[in-house]
Amino acid sequence: MALGQKLFITMSRGAGRLQGTLWALVFLGILVGMVVPSPAGTRANNTLLDSRGWGTLLSRSRAGLAGEIAGVNWESGYLVGIKRQRRLYCNVGIGFHLQVLPDGRISGTHEENPYSLLEISTVERGVVSLFGVRSALFVAMNSKGRLYATPSFQEECKFRETLLPNNYNAYESDLYQGTYIALSKYGRVKRGSKVSPIMTVTHFLPRI
């Protein structure tokens, strides 16, 4: 009788261990099923990743194209319409700044004054206009190479701005090629058709 009871207890304990082992295996299987996706799920995820990858590539391509277009727009905006307020200094004689007086006269002044402050505006690539800030008059040049001032912008107000090797600028009439803004050693304007860019009288340094 005692031997039978011991055998029953031993078998019960073994069954308990076996049952615990089975439960552990079932739980482990559930975990593995949660971690490892099914083949269909894998294919779906790969498709999703592929679509996302193409979408990202496409969006980057579009962004690059937009950046290129924006760069062109920025360049156009930079080259056309930018304004600078400067004084144009000509290093002849004692040195003169180009000035535009209210009565329409244009000349050189040794000392800086409100009439020597010019607004240099880009109107085309490499072409600018010169506007007297205080006098509210544009610098213009006629077909004879004579400078004059006008309250309204016109074709004779366009000057081609060229950077020279000495870092000075030369201002050539865009309408009448070969005529330049120039100041004599006495500060008087010279006829633009009588000078050339190799002459110091046509060299101007923009100053703030």
UniProtKB/Swiss-Prot annotation:
This is Fibroblast growth factor 6. The gene is FGF6. GO terms for cellular component: cytoplasm; extracellular region; extracellular space; sarcolemma. Residues 1-37 form the signal peptide. Interacts with FGFR1, FGFR2 and FGFR4. Affinity between fibroblast growth factors (FGFs) and their receptors is increased by heparan sulfate glycosaminoglycans that function as coreceptors. It is found in: Secreted, Extracellular space. PROSITE patterns: HBGF_FGF (PS00247). Its main location: secreted. SUPFAM superfamilies: Cytokine. Keywords: Angiogenesis, Developmental protein, Differentiation, Disulfide bond, Glycoprotein, Growth factor, Mitogen, Proto-oncogene, Secreted, Signal. Disulfide bonds join C90-C157. Belongs to the heparin-binding growth factors family.
